[in-house]
Structures are given as C-alpha cells and as structure tokens.
Amino acid sequence: MMDRDSFLQKYAGHLNEKQLAAVQTVNGPVLLLAVPGSGKTTVLVTRLGYMLYCEGIRPENILTLTYTVAATKDMARRFREIFGEEYSNALEFRTINGICARVIARYGQMIGKSAFELLTDEKVILRMLTEILVQNLS
C-alpha cells in the first residue's frame, strides 16, 4: 500500500484537476470524454494504479474493457511501463468480445461442454454459410 499523497506525487503530478478527480474516483463509474491524445488512457492506467496501491483493491477484482485489441495491448503495456510487473499479469485487460468469449468458455466448463472455437478461416466460414443457406432454402 502507498499513501494517497505519495502516489499522486509519484504518478499523477502531470495530470490536471479533472484528471486527478477521475483517478481518485474509485466507487462508481467514471466517464472520460476528450479528444485523441488528451490523456484518457494515461488517466485510466493511473486510476488502476491508484485502485491497487492506494485503495488496496486486489487485481483479480478489476476488469479493464476496451473496444479494440490494439487498445487492450496499449493499456497493458502502459501499465507495465509505469507500475512494473507486480500486478501486470494479474490484471485483466480485455476487449468486450474477449470477456464475452471467456464467460462463454467458463460456462461451458461448468456444464461439462468443451470450449467453442472461433472460426477465422474464410473458406470454412463460406462453406458453412452455404450449407446453412442450402438447408434453409430447400
């Protein structure tokens, strides 16, 4: 654990007043609306650090969702660069699709079903769609 003032001095000295408020808001949602390059990811990463190091929230109790794989990788990389390895591997950085796939896979395990496979081969997808169309149009 780290006291609030030490954390803010070490990791958040470059943030403005509204960004600091977002970092320190732990209970409830925080909405960050700003133009690209304004520091949204920096605020989120700093907020994660604040939750872990100042509030004592366990990394297993934090889920960070993004829309794209690139954003997920960027956020995880930035967290690791700023805060090191201590919590990096325990935090969940996922896309919305990624967390949904994980929930489905875990549910499948719970009921004794094997995990599904994501089809990415376009030829296989086209063949399956053709079979479905033929079956349903006959």
Annotate each language-model stretch with its function.
Residues M1-I111:
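P-loop NTPase Walker
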Residues S88-A90, Q109-S138:
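ATP-hydrolysis module of ASCE/P-loop NTPase motor domains
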